[in-house]
Swiss-Prot record:
It comes from Staphylococcus carnosus (strain TM300). One of its GO terms (cellular component) is cytosolic large ribosomal subunit. It comes from the Bacteria. Keywords: Ribonucleoprotein, Ribosomal protein. Part of the 50S ribosomal subunit. CDD domains: Ribosomal_L13. Belongs to the universal ribosomal protein uL13 family. This is Large ribosomal subunit protein uL13. The lineage of its organism: Bacteria, Bacillati, Bacillota, Bacilli, Bacillales. GO terms for biological process: negative regulation of translation; translation.
Amino acid sequence: MRQTFMANESNIERKWYVIDAAGQTLGRLSSEVASILRGKHKATYTPHVDSGDYVIIINAGQIEMTGKKASDKVYYRHSNYPGGIKSITAGELREKNPERLLEISIKGMLPSSRLGEKQGKKLFVYGGAEHPHAAQQPENYELRG
């Protein structure tokens, strides 16, 4: 009798992918990257195991947003002091720290659990075209669509 294949840490092969964010739409890129980080693009995907690959995103400063999201979408954070709420629009965040904009978007699409945190640590975002991960021999990844 055959049994359903269940992946575990010992039989997972991880790859490194480089994705160029120049000219890509924020949400479409984020959902694709979140899927790669979770391992859903593999036939051996197992929900309770971190089977995803490493992702390097370059040119994060050239990401695009559709519609009026640059001026209307607001990100909030709080300092835990009374009256300590801070806000920044997506356009301001893209100018100030484009890497953080992509990280917030992608990590928001991962599960909010210990497994999701582990999957989020395999994401590396850089504003320019250079990255320090040449030793891992990353492959270029072509996005769908």
